[in-house]
Regions:
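Small beta-barrel nucleic-acid-binding modules, primarily SNase/OB-fold domains
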Residues: 2-5, 13-159
């Protein structure tokens, strides 16, 4: 019994959970939502940060804002269901989320508003390949990958 208790404690400390959370979502940014008080990070994708800018045909646009507001528009007051089994270091559930029968994570990548976050998952690479080929969203111009942007990298200002 003692060994079982230790195992369960270690399992809980490791961030492993199994969650199915549903409800209307509050949007934090393009890849983070809150449902019923639980913060959810969309699995396997990374959207531009809220204040990140990109460039298309020489014109700067707010790609982070666009990702956030597009997600807000898709979700509005709809029921969102998220399925995940781990939490990240910030305590957010890492999950695949669904609304109206489609996978939000996949849709954001397919529309070119998010990148497949290969460091953590290969799941959405096919959607990214399609967005790149069709030059949708971010792929229509220049951008810095969100993970590089968070490290301080920016678009060349002398474009």
């Amino acid at each position: 019994m003692k060994h079982m208790y230790i195992f369960l404690c270690l399992l809980l400390l490791s961030g492993v959970v199994s969650a199915d959370v549903s409800g209307t979502a509050l949007i934090s940014d393009g890849d983070t939502i809150t449902i019923s008080g639980m913060k959810v990070r969309l699995n396997g994708i990374d959207t531009p940060e809220r204040d990140q800018t990109c460039r298309k045909a020489g014109v700067t646009w707010k790609c982070g804002y666009k990702a956030t507001e597009t997600l807000r528009g898709w979700l509005d007051t709809k029921e969102v269901r998220c399925l995940g089994d781990i939490k990240d270091r910030y305590g957010r559930l890492i999950a695949d989320c669904f609304v109206d029968g489609y996978n939000l994570n996949a849709k954001l990548v397919y529309e070119g508003l998010a990148l497949a976050y290969r460091k953590y998952s290969k799941k959405y690479i096919p959607e990214e390949d399609k967005a790149r080929a069709a030059k949708r969203g971010l792929w229509a111009g220049e951008f810095v990958a969100p993970w590089d942007w968070r490290k301080g990298k920016r678009l060349d200002p002398d474009y």
